[in-house]
Amino acid sequence: MGTLILVAGENGSGKSRCAENIVAQTTGRRYYIATMQPCSEENLRRVEKHRRQRRDLRFTTLELPHRVGAAAVENGSVVLLEDVSNLLANVMFECGGNEESVYGDIEALLSRCRILVAVTITGLREDGYDGETAAYIRALNGLNQRLLARAAAALTMKDRQPFAEKGELNEII
């Protein structure tokens, strides 16, 4: 069973760069699981920015909008999962899945990794939303809490600075 490191923060907080920096300190085979399905110009720009950022990090990139538990990763590898919020949205809105199915998928992936660095969005509130959007926000907040409880280490990004919420990275990587 692998070690989970959770990197959380609001949009634009620097969480992706932080996660990439963590993975850059590791040895062995590295995978980048991209879950975003770019459907707007802004999303396409974000995907391109992330590709440029990780160009020199020797990742094997896997584009998987869902079913990350079945990802073709080498046992004992290091995996960056970018990101949990997109994965959950894809599973809920395209596949009829839920928080539980995503958590199980992440656990299945984690069982084959040495280290899994999972990126997620925090700070979303249900206020002003109803229906599917409110259900998604509740599910994401619940999933984030479960991942935080499961993680050996967790960082929260604020003003592009990482703050340790749990564990010691130096003991893991």
Predicted feature descriptions by range:
Residues M1-G2, E74, E107-L110:
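Catalytic phosphate/metal-binding cores of nucleic-acid and nucleotide-processing enzymes, i.e., regions
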Residues G2-V73:
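Conserved P-loop
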Residues T3-V7, R30, S77-N86, I115-A118:
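Generic beta-sheet signal
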Residues N11-G12, Q37, S85, G123-L124, ...:
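Short, glycine/serine-rich, charged loops/turns that create anion-binding
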Residues A19, H50, L80, I121, ...:
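Residue-level signal for inorganic ion chemistry
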Residues T27, R58, G76-S77, C113, ...:
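Short, well-ordered alpha-helix to beta-strand connector turns
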Residues R52, L57-E100:
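Helix-adjacent hinge/juxtasegments
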